[in-house]
Amino acid sequence: MVLAVLIGVLVGIVLVSSLLLRWNEVRYSRKQGLPPGTMGWPLFGETTEFLKQGPSFMKARRLRYGSLFRTHILGCPTVVCMDPELNRQMLQQGEGRGFVPGYPQSMLDILGRNNIAAVHGPLHRAMRGSMLALVRPASIRSSLLPKIDAFMRSHLHGWAGDLVDIQDKTKEMALLSALRQIAGITAGPLSDALKTELYTLVLGTISLPINLPGTSYYQGFQARKKLVSMLEKMIAERRSSGLVHNDMLDALLSGNDGTRERLSDEQIIDLIITLIYSGYETMSTTSMMAVKYLSDHPKALEELRKEHFDIRKGKSPEEAIDYNDFKSMTFTRAVIFETLRLATVVNGLLRKTTQDVEMNGYVIPKGWRIYVYTREINYDPCLYPDPMTFNPWRWLEKNMESHPHFMLFGGGGRMCPGKEVGTAEIATFLHYFVTRYRWEEEGTNTILKFPRVEAPNGLHIRVQNY
């Protein structure tokens, strides 16, 4: 009797599961002209498979359905595009063709609806203008690079003789460097409090928007609330004190130079959170993976050291590097770009359709997301011969940055505005790291590359003076 009931329950579960899956397919298949694909479960879609399998999920569906297929991930019906030319066109055409940013609800809620990656139209132009003014070449030369140099010189002091988790060190480095440039915050109780909340916030941005205690989304959203409160207090103190700090927050609060629209406090806070988030993610991961790749490729490390010791010739030990030094770091730039490419620090970009859009004979309905999946472009042997090999020299052979399918920093009118200052930060880190130290990896260090690049148990190196 018990066995019969158990079998009945199991059969019932199978039938209900099959009906739910079938209902979700029929629900979306009513729309005419959709690309092929599957939609998974109601609400959850195929999010679990996507986050667990990552690139394997994408490759399997491309083999089955082609370079344009439909799925349901992160709470949204989504079309994945793995075609390099279609991706280039989407990024170039942007809003004029019906494509606006389409980041998942979790990211919108946690980074803020005014974050520069999510807004479009006049607000995006205003926020992008404000950000570009902060990171233009003149600002890097006169203000940002001197601060970056002083910070890196201090942060990398005294590592010799230690067993260092370079993942932790680069995370701390990226966050503290961003806080110093944006709001003049140095290491101390305030930076520690901000660091705790920012680490939690980052984990919540790629999650299902389920607002229940214990979920990554809930924790990330609570962290955002605390960060907003801290930043509101900081802004109020700046205004009441009247002191000049000569940092990014000062520039944003002081209004404009007559050419830009003034941002509200809410917009400034969302911009600051996004600046810290994007810089932290990209800079920390790229710096860590550059150390890893250089460890594994001694010839590249030797070439990099030569470039940086040549720069130090004629400088006193405490003399800072300047903008001309940074612009002369051609091999360093190649190492950074090759690290971004091979590690795939950014897997792709999300867009949303504002109207029905025709693409390769299919119709993408209004309101759907399009995942501009650029990861496989990084491994295309037609663009990058022997693509799985770390080869910085490939970036010196021709001007790869002008290649139409160069998408390491996005594309079109949404090319990452912080590209140069981010490159300057990583280049300065490498300058002091390779001229001061030699290192060896210790233990077994596992690297995961999806949904974000990380070393789950750390990346440990034994550091000695050079």
UniProtKB/Swiss-Prot annotation:
It is found in: Membrane. It is an enzyme of class 1 (oxidoreductase). One of its GO terms (cellular component) is membrane. It catalyses: 6-deoxoteasterone + reduced [NADPH--hemoprotein reductase] + O2 = 6alpha-hydroxyteasterone + oxidized [NADPH--hemoprotein reductase] + H2O + H(+); 6alpha-hydroxytyphasterol + reduced [NADPH--hemoprotein reductase] + O2 = teasterone + oxidized [NADPH--hemoprotein reductase] + 2 H2O + H(+); 3-dehydro-6-deoxoteasterone + reduced [NADPH--hemoprotein reductase] + O2 = 3-dehydro-6alpha-hydroxyteasterone + oxidized [NADPH--hemoprotein reductase] + H2O + H(+); 3-dehydro-6alpha-hydroxyteasterone + reduced [NADPH--hemoprotein reductase] + O2 = 3-dehydroteasterone + oxidized [NADPH--hemoprotein reductase] + 2 H2O + H(+). One of its GO terms (biological process) is skotomorphogenesis. Involved in reduction steps of the biosynthesis of plant campesterol-derivative steroids, ending to castasterone (CS) but missing brassinolide (BL). Catalyzes the C6-oxidation step in brassinosteroids biosynthesis; the conversion of 6-deoxoteasterone (6-deoxoTE) to teasterone (TE), 3-dehydro-6-deoxoteasterone (6-deoxo3DT, 6-deoxo-3-DHT) to 3-dehydroteasterone (3DT, 3-DHT), 6-deoxotyphasterol (6-deoxoTY) to typhasterol (TY) and of 6-deoxocastasterone (6-deoxoCS) to castasterone (CS). This is Cytochrome P450 85A1. It comes from Brachypodium distachyon. The lineage of its organism: Eukaryota, Viridiplantae, Streptophyta, Embryophyta, Tracheophyta.
